[in-house]
Amino acid sequence: TLRGKVGDKFEITIKNEGSMAHSIDFHAGEVNPDETMKSIRPGEELTYKFTAHRSGIWMYHCSTMPMSLHIANGMAGNVIIDPPNLKPVDAEYNFMATDVFLGEENTGADAQRRPLRPHGL
C-alpha cells in the first residue's frame, strides 16, 4: 500500500528483474499511460512520477497483458490519498481482493471467461 496526502509527489522506480515485461498503472496518478506507464522489459527500469490531486483510495496494478493473471498473482495494491485536515480514527482496515476466472483446461484466464462452478466451490 502506498499512502500520501493531497499535494504529495510520488516517485517510484521499478527495476524489472523478472523474465517478462511488466508495468504499473497508478489509478490515482492521472498520468498519460503512453509515456510513463509503458511495459518495462526484463533488465530495464522506469521511474513513475505523479502528484496526488484528489483524495481517495485507488488501485495500482501491473497493466501488461495478461493483466488479469498478473493481478491475480498479487501484482496489485492500494494507493490511499488522505484529504486535508483528516480527523483521526480509532481503527483503519485496508483490504484488497482479486478474482481470476478460469476457462476450460489450458485456455488461460481473463475477464471474458466465467467461473467453471458459478454456484460454489
Where are these regions (language model features)?
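Short loop/turn segments at secondary-structure transitions that flank enzyme active sites
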Residues: E30, S68, N85, F101-E104
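A short, polar/charged loop/turn motif at coil->beta-strand junctions and beta-hairpin connectors
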Residues: G18, V89-A91, P115-R117
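Low-complexity, Pro/Ser/Thr- and charge-rich linker/hinge segments at domain boundaries
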Residues: I80-M96, E104
